[in-house]
């Protein structure tokens, strides 16, 4: 199983879900979104604990995960978003190291250019590409995860 994860680009006023996609050995592709926004009355680290629990659940339910590819965001809308991204990146890469799973970040422009032919594609463009491939993404985060999956499946790394 190859796992493709988008690290959340959450911001306090507008939290976004994490898009994900899995390519199973039998060729089955599953995808979706997951929310890790801080809940009321929670400490700041709870979102990361939920993230790690979710990673472990995916690993357990999908069998062996042989690679993780994630969206490498180089610009953030603000300090809070940068801190959240750094926290998720730290936990994701440590989790991969702990389980001896290779991982690679993929720049946003690379994902968009591979999917649409232009590195500055809009969210709607990314959703349209996913739909053209036969998927029904909930939002652009899931569409981006599917784009990363296809980038990796086509050996672009």
Predicted features and spans:
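Phosphate- and other anionic-substrate recognition elements at nucleic-acid/protein interfaces
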Residues: 1-157
């Amino acid at each position: 199983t190859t796992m493709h994860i988008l690290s959340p680009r959450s911001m306090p006023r507008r939290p976004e879900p994490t898009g994900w996609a899995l390519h199973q050995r039998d060729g089955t592709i599953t995808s979706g979104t997951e929310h890790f926004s801080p809940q009321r009355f929670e400490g700041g680290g709870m979102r990361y604990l939920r993230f790690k629990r979710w990673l472990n659940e995916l690993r357990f339910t999908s069998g062996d995960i042989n690679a993780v590819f994630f969206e490498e965001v180089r610009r953030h809308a603000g300090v809070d978003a940068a801190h959240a991204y750094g926290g998720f990146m730290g936990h994701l890469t440590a989790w991969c190291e702990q389980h001896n799973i290779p991982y690679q970040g993929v720049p946003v422009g690379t994902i968009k250019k591979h999917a649409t032919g232009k590195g500055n594609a809009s969210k709607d463009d990314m959703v349209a590409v996913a739909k053209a491939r036969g998927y029904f993404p909930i939002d652009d985060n899931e569409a981006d995860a599917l784009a990363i999956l296809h980038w990796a499946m086509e050996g672009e790394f």
